[in-house]
Amino acid sequence: MAKDKKFVEDITPMDEDFAQWYTDIVKKAELADYSSIRGCMIIRPNGYAIWENIQKYVDTKLKEYGHENVSMPIFIPENLLQKEKDHVEGFAPEVAWVTHGGDDELAERLCVRPTSETLFCEHYAKIVQSYKDLPKLYNQWCSVVRWEKTTRPFLRTTEFLWQEGHTIHETKEEAESHSLKILNMYSRLCEDMLAMPVVMGKKTDKEKFAGADDTYTIESLMHDGKALQAGTSHYLGQNFSKAFAIQFSDRNGKLDYPHYTTWAVTTRLIGAIIMVHGDNSGLKLPPRIAPTQAVIIPVAQHKEGVLEKAEELKERLAKVVRVKLDDSDKMPGWKYSEYEMKGIPLRIEIGPKDIEKNQAVLVRRDNREKTIVSLDEIEIKVQEMLDIIHNSMLEEAKKTRDEKTYVATNMEEFEDTIENKPGFIKAMWCGDRACEDKIREVTGATSRCMPFEQEVVSDTCVCCGKKAKNLVYWGRAY
């Protein structure tokens, strides 16, 4: 029992060592474990179930929008990767290469896919002939490999799971609209399912995807004041279409190149959930994404009728929520701590006195509030409570983000803020790449996005003092 107690309690306080706090939660909440391959992880059932719920939401939305799922090869021939110059230069440092098949050296190196634009383009060039064949709306769920130098579970790994959408369209307007539609869906995923507020905006040319005309992003802020890119959607223009000779006959019978979009979210969203909502007691899961939304803990379960009533309660609640009954022989106090550490949104306690009074006790993970409810209406009350928890977690995350969002009008303010008050910094920018580079060199902060909701916090660029063009969110990032 002493060992069990230590397992539950031994989480490094986030204010003491945020990185270790994060690692402790990943391991102790049984989300993932390290593998023997540097930078790769084993996603355990608790972590994978969260990903499955993310998948379910995204996959349902994509199918509502008319997308179809496909599966592309994991290998890309080197000559294919070389076809789009900017693209290959952007990914070259991260590519893993296969040079041998068995004992035989391959005639051409094969890249282990870091992303699949080249494969989709090769396929689209074969199947598209007319505007009547458009749009093509494809998506795939897979893993990709990027040989990262610095890794951390979920946030930045050598191999990770994602969905990658690849669509081609007849017109620029249609493609741009589609790219923004997907970004909006990602925003809804984060806020409606993960209770995680995001800033929507456009990347600067320096930060956009390799080979893209425009990259749109959703940016979130973690507990420690660092930013995290939660999802991206790219308008690639006709760059890839021309490189891969994808052509179609337009409505006037002339040959044209389709306009391309690509977009993705990954398992790094699980890392974001940990760092936006977690506390020193462990993980805090938003109810709508939690694999188990409520756990029933029988109190004095050795007494007559307690386990039977708990089983009955589980059967009733299983019709409306994802519920678990823990009837193990561990002490209730240990169970409380364990499920708090694992982030289960709602705990339901029921013991002999509760049964006598036809009631149960609901305990919220987010703020530990207790509510007594009648067993006659427990299905409704539990569902209502889960919605309350979601809304409360979202509002708390918004409050934290807003409190850690600052304004800087010159470099002195910028440097002082980034060193002493980590968070988002809203500052004006002239549009010059040199200023963007200097800000990163001096402060370690990168441009996160030019938000769609622009405001003027100063007339001049925070770096050079010249006339400003855009408001930019800046920050140090994962």
UniProtKB/Swiss-Prot annotation:
Main location: cytoplasm
Gene3D superfamilies: Anticodon-binding domain (3.40.50.800), Bira Bifunctional Protein, Domain 2 (3.30.930.10), C-terminal domain of ProRS (3.30.110.30)
CDD domains (alphabetical): ProRS_anticodon_zinc, ProRS_core_arch_euk
Enzyme Commission (EC) number: 6.1.1.15
Pfam families assigned: HGTP_anticodon, ProRS-C_1, tRNA-synt_2b
Keyword set includes Nucleotide-binding: yes
One cellular component term from this protein's GO annotations in UniProt: aminoacyl-tRNA synthetase multienzyme complex
GO molecular function terms noted in the UniProt entry: ATP binding; catalytic activity, acting on a protein; proline-tRNA ligase activity; transferase activity
Reaction catalysis annotation: tRNA(Pro) + L-proline + ATP = L-prolyl-tRNA(Pro) + AMP + diphosphate
NCBIfam families for this protein: proS_fam_I
Entry text on domains: Consists of three domains: the N-terminal catalytic domain, the anticodon-binding domain and the C-terminal extension.
UniProt-recorded name of the protein: Proline--tRNA ligase
UniProt source species: Clostridium botulinum (strain Langeland / NCTC 10281 / Type F)
Organism lineage string: Bacteria, Bacillati, Bacillota, Clostridia, Eubacteriales
